[in-house]
């Protein structure tokens, strides 16, 4: 899949912002057909970071939400600031 089509939008909620600050995780709504390797590759390509792991949840609305944990040498706060979450 095209990395720019995998990530639909970032999630901007209190929980998502607290995860950025405390756990070095970013939260995105992603394409329903995307797999964990697709999401990892897309985040690494689009935001120029290294991903540690990806967790996926299908929401009650039918959207696929991805929790992306970054490697310790990268800051989720800096990436969030670049994409306009803060």
UniProtKB/Swiss-Prot annotation:
InterPro entries xref list: Nucleotide-bd_a/b_plait_sf, Ribosomal_uL23, Ribosomal_uL23-like, Ribosomal_uL23/eL15/eS24_sf, Ribosomal_uL23_CS
Keyword set, alphabetical order: Ribonucleoprotein, Ribosomal protein, RNA-binding, rRNA-binding
PROSITE patterns noted in UniProt: RIBOSOMAL_L23
Domain of life: Archaea
Transmembrane stretches, start-end: none
Pfam families in UniProt: Ribosomal_L23
GO (cellular component) term, any one: ribosome
Swiss-Prot/TrEMBL GO biological process terms: translation
Similarity comment: Belongs to the universal ribosomal protein uL23 family.
HAMAP family in UniProt: Ribosomal_uL23_A, Ribosomal_uL23_B
Subunit record text: Part of the 50S ribosomal subunit. Contacts protein L29.
Role of this protein: Binds to 23S rRNA. One of the proteins that surrounds the polypeptide exit tunnel on the outside of the ribosome.
Name this polypeptide is given: Large ribosomal subunit protein uL23
């Amino acid at each position: 899949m095209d990395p720019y089509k995998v990530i639909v939008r970032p999630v901007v909620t209190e929980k998502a912002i607290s995860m950025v600050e405390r756990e070095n995780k970013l939260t995105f709504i992603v394409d329903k057909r995307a797999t964990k390797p697709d999401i990892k590759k897309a985040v690494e390509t689009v935001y120029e970071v290294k991903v540690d792991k990806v967790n996926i949840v299908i929401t009650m609305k039918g959207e696929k939400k991805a929790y992306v944990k970054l490697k310790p040498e990268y800051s989720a706060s800096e990436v969030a600031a670049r994409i306009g979450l803060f």
